[in-house]
């Protein structure tokens, strides 16, 4: 069975280092450790990776790999996930979500 990779790229309204680090901290607080998570990572764009193919129009990246589609679907309605959205959405200029079936 394929795992589901949930990748989210946030562009902030206020793109200061303090705000980007605050969003990374919120990702770690609210989005890590959900049932069915096999990988979690959150961080900021790498400043010196600027080849022509690099997309750099985001501030914070979130990657969560779930063991199944069912685990992903449960995460979407989990209270901690919804609280993360409620608390952080006011500073989002854009959010892009990429979901993919993946396997090793």
What kind of feature is each model-predicted range?
Residues 69-95:
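C-terminal structural segments of small proteins and small subunits
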Residues 1-59, 63, 67-74, 100-104:
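Short S/T/G/P-rich N-terminal loop/turn motif that feeds into the first structured element of a domain
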């Amino acid at each position: 069975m394929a795992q589901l990779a949930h990748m989210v790229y946030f562009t902030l309204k206020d793109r200061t280092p303090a705000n980007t680090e605050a969003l990374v901290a919120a990702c770690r607080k609210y989005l890590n450790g959900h049932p069915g998570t096999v990988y979690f990572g959150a961080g900021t764009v790498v400043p010196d990776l600027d080849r022509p193919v690099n997309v750099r129009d985001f501030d914070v990246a979130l990657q969560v790999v779930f063991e199944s589609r069912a685990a992903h679907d449960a995460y979407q309605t989990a209270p901690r996930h919804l609280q993360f959205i409620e608390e952080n959405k006011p500073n989002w200029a854009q959010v892009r979500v990429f979901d993919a079936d993946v396997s090793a």
